[in-house]
Amino acid sequence: MLLYYILVALWATVTYAKSFSEDISEMPELSEMSSYLNQTPEAKDVLDQQKNVTLLALENSAFRDFVGQGEGNDNQSSSNSSLLRGIFSYQLVKGLHNSEQITTTPQFSPTELNDAGFTNVSSGQIVQLVEKDGKDYAISGLNDNSTIIKPGVDVENGVIHVIDRPLTLPQSVTATLQAANLTSFQGALQRGNAVSNANDPKDITLFAPRNLGFQRIGTAFENISAEDLGQIANYHIVKGKVLYSPDLTDADHPTYADKDLHISTVDGRSYVNSARVESTNLLVNNGVIHVISDVLNPNNDTAKPVPNADPPPPAFENANPVSTDPLTDGIPSPTSVIPLPGITSGGEGGGGGGGESTAPPSPTATVTETQSGGGGGGGGGAGGGPGPTATNTPQPGAAATERAKAGLAAVVGLGVVLINA
């Protein structure tokens, strides 16, 4: 008889282990999501199969807004259901990340997003989990900050955090450079025929100089050949390694210019050769971008940091400054610029947006492409119109996407994903 009761108790334990959907149904902040799951058995089944994951779930108003937007774009949503499923996968973080584990030291956590159409990172696309000013955030593509508005709830199959806005899928290198107004380097990649080395390979780290860094040596690009410019651009791309801010320690790394660059730390600040690291951890779909003060020179690969110099000494001798952004002829200028993240590896100060904006990190701004306001060509070139500025207008999930229209990219909530499940 005792054995019978033991078996019954074990059976009950297995039978009544809660699923994700059951846990969600008990959270008032997720009642909209719960209601929709009950109406969408296929989506509910997919979610309930997840184990040992951390779910970043949209709170009610955000969920409701995105469901409404999705229903208003049925034809477009249907044709891009794979994109929406990709966003859903991106909001499922591998492993257990409760509130106590999210600290001021950033975590670069792999997610369930492994679809080769959207990511080319071996571990699965990364989301950054970090505490800032007493609040916890999930930081995604284009430096989009989603606030965790309810501390993580430990449930049977993982952890549930409630967030106030959906994550943004990391974009390609070139789309991200444009959104951040790092357009001189974007121009260097294009004119140097190095775009494929930036956008296509798996697991890269790219050090993008600010536009002001190009201006400081603008005459170096007058009449430069495509081959020489490509060598310079390729020297900024580390092969086969995704180096997040904690990895920016003393070491040499191979680049697509077939020369090593050297990372060093001085007084808690990171340098690449002699260039100062000014912004870190801008996620892209095949790795990460860090912003540096100046252009690296593959023919001066022994350049060393000069910590007391501000600005750092340029790596190009005999080059003179120009007053406009070099290499930006034909590069569309965004009408607004995403604010860049600050330095999270220690050091002093933080990054500004694209070298021109001083706006602090905030919800992703809308990124609109336009042909006006471009900078000059080969050297300083002709001046453009007024430069883009940062805006803090909240546009959850907005992104300058290539695989899907920006309008659809803004309709990126878990709710929309579930519509197409």
Swiss-Prot record:
It is a lipid-anchor; GPI-anchor. GO terms for biological process: macroautophagy. Residues 388-401 have a biased composition (Low complexity). Residues 344-356, 372-387 have a biased composition (Gly residues). InterPro entries: Adhesion/Biosynth-related, FAS1_dom_sf, FAS1_domain. Residues 398-421 form a propeptide. Belongs to the fasciclin-like AGP family. This is Fasciclin-like arabinogalactan protein ARB_02922. Keywords: Cell membrane, Glycoprotein, GPI-anchor, Lipoprotein, Membrane, Repeat, Signal. One of its GO terms (cellular component) is plasma membrane. The keyword Transcription regulation does not apply.
